[in-house]
Amino acid sequence: MNVKVNGDFREIPDGETVRALVARYNLKPEKVAIELNRRLVRSEKYDTALNDGDEIEIVTFVGGG
């Protein structure tokens, strides 16, 4: 199925979850914010299955000062 991740179309397996997508990009769940179809996904909902045409934004937190 096809989804849009940070503005780019990507093909992912059917039934992939938010958690699996985070793992696919080797991201640490505690260091990212995920938006699915313009709604923030709380970490306890990362087992939500993605659907064809979904739009995902991944924001990575970085420290600095």
Go through each PLM region and give its residues.
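Ubiquitin-like/PB1-type beta-grasp interaction modules and other compact soluble beta-rich domains
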Residues: 1-64
